[in-house]
């Protein structure tokens, strides 16, 4: 039995780990049942992939010299479910191609990306689920099932964003897109109040490739929701040349301003010079910058460094109808507890199939708060109050999953998910999927 801790180190669970090995490679496959939680490579710090006093099924990491099957005409790639986004992109870059969606951390595996239907800063256009051609899963009846939009389509849609409730994802075929430019034009815009906030995130400009922002909840009611936002556009005419060989395209890393670099190294160590995203936040209103491998992973690195020095992050999924009310309560609580925080709000992801998908429907509020008594009190208050607003902490981060919350947050989508699951598999999703029994009202 192994012990797993949540990303903030505040909660731990004990689970028995069992390994799945592909029969084709001479390994042993064994009968599993619905009490198993699919854990993939076991690299996730999210407790949703570890069952307390239960069983987890994992897949051994593949060889370092792994190969991918790529079809340049169709722009698709065949991969193992335990290949990471960064490994695939490094390979695809050599052909002038890339994955259309990259999550916040580069080492996330494809299986995890499918199970949580991850998204990047282009989530207002599409999520990772829209980029999947097909995959194979090992069901809880020990059956290997091929799934696509045309073959076993119900299982295909239930698996995307289904957190492993249909079985263990083994491999996948994914879409790639051409890298049409190496430069992005980033425009920074001021947002004065909640009305401008709504207008900013409802932008339907087809040329946008990314959009995000930071909003201050310490302001007065008139300026509530104010802050600034970024909009990213590709700069045409900078098309890269590529070849047919397995090579990677690299660029020299930008250096942070010397004063910032020196301070960062002093506070956080030598890894700080890799946190390029901080530089972009310090730039002037408009900027041009080169695309580089793992662009969003540097943000992940930045937060990991902060966490190791006394910071932590909370994310909530809030229904559209309630998010302004919820934000107002957050602002009130900040003042009440004299807490210090910044808030990031991203536009809701779009679900193409109308299926229940845990990928951030509603509005995500990321609160990065310095560890202190006042901030812990603030966080506990917000966690307990979230459910009264129909909001839940992001389950991919906090592993909180209760059927009553799911139904309230997702409504008809949740009912469709349950009914389709029961129609296909003859019963409800696994118990750990609906309520893992670890969390109750006092530690929500």
Give a label for each model feature:
Residues 300, 374-380, 387-444:
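Activity-critical C-terminal alpha-helical subdomain
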Residues 224-233, 283-289, 351-363, 406-415:
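Short glycine/threonine-rich loop-to-helix capping motif typified by GTGT followed
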Residues 8-107, 117-122, 346, 395-398:
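Glycine-rich N-terminal segment of FAD-binding domains in flavoprotein oxidoreductases
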Residues 316-369:
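C-terminal structural cap/anchor segments
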Residues 115, 133-325, 329-332:
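C-terminal substrate-binding/cap subdomain adjacent to the FAD-binding core in PCMH-type
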Residues 210-216, 311-316, 339-352, 393-399:
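A short glycine-rich, hydrophobically flanked beta-strand micro-motif that places a catalytic Asp/Glu
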Residues 81, 323, 334-337, 364-366, ...:
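Extended C-terminal subregions enriched in glycine
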């Amino acid at each position: 039995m192994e012990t797993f801790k949540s990303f903030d180190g505040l909660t731990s669970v004990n689970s028995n780990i069992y390994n799945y090995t592909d029969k084709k490679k001479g390994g042993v496959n064994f009968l599993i049942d619905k009490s198993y939680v699919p854990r993939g490579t076991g690299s996730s710090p999210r407790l949703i992939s570890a069952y307390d006093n239960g069983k987890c099924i994992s897949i051994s990491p593949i060889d370092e010299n792994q190969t991918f099957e790529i079809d340049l005409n169709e722009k698709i790639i065949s991969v193992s479910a335990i290949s990471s986004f960064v490994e695939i992109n490094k390979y695809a870059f050599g052909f002038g191609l890339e994955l259309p969606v990259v999550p916040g951390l580069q080492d996330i595996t494809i299986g995890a990306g499918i199970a949580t239907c991850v998204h990047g800063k282009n989530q207002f256009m599409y999520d990772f689920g829209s980029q999947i051609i097909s995959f194979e899963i090992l069901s809880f009846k020990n059956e290997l099932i091929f799934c696509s939009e045309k073959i076993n389509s119900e299982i295909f849609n239930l698996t995307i964003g289904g957190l492993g409730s249909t079985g263990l994802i083994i491999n996948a075929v994914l879409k790639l897109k051409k890298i049409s430019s190496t430069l992005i034009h980033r425009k920074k815009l001021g947002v004065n109040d909640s009305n401008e906030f709504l207008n900013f995130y409802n932008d339907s400009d087809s040329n946008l490739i990314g959009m995000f922002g930071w909003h201050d909840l310490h302001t007065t009611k008139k300026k509530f929701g104010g802050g600034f936002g970024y909009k990213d556009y590709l700069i045409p005419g900078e098309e890269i040349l590529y070849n047919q060989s397995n090579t990677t395209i690299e660029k020299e890393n930008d250096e942070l301003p010397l004063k910032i670099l020196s301070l960062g190294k002093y506070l956080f160590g030598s890894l700080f010079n890799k946190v390029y995203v901080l530089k972009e936040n310090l730039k002037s209103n408009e900027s041009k910058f080169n695309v580089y491998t793992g662009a969003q992973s540097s943000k992940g690195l930045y937060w990991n460094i902060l966490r190791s020095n006394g910071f932590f992050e909370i994310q909530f999924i809030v229904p559209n109808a309630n998010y302004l009310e919820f934000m107002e309560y957050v602002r009130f609580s900040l003042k009440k507890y004299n807490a210090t925080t910044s808030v990031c709000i991203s536009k809701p992801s779009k679900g193409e199939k109308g299926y229940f998908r845990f990928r951030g429907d509603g509005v995500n509020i990321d609160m990065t708060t310095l560890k202190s008594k006042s901030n812990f009190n603030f966080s506990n208050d917000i966690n307990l109050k979230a459910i009264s607003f129909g909001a839940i902490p992001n389950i991919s981060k906090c592993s909180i999953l209760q059927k009553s919350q799911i139904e309230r947050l997702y409504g008809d989508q949740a009912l469709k998910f349950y009914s389709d699951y029961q129609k296909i598999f003859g019963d409800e999703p696994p118990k750990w999927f609906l309520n893992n029994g670890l969390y109750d009202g006092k530690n929500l």
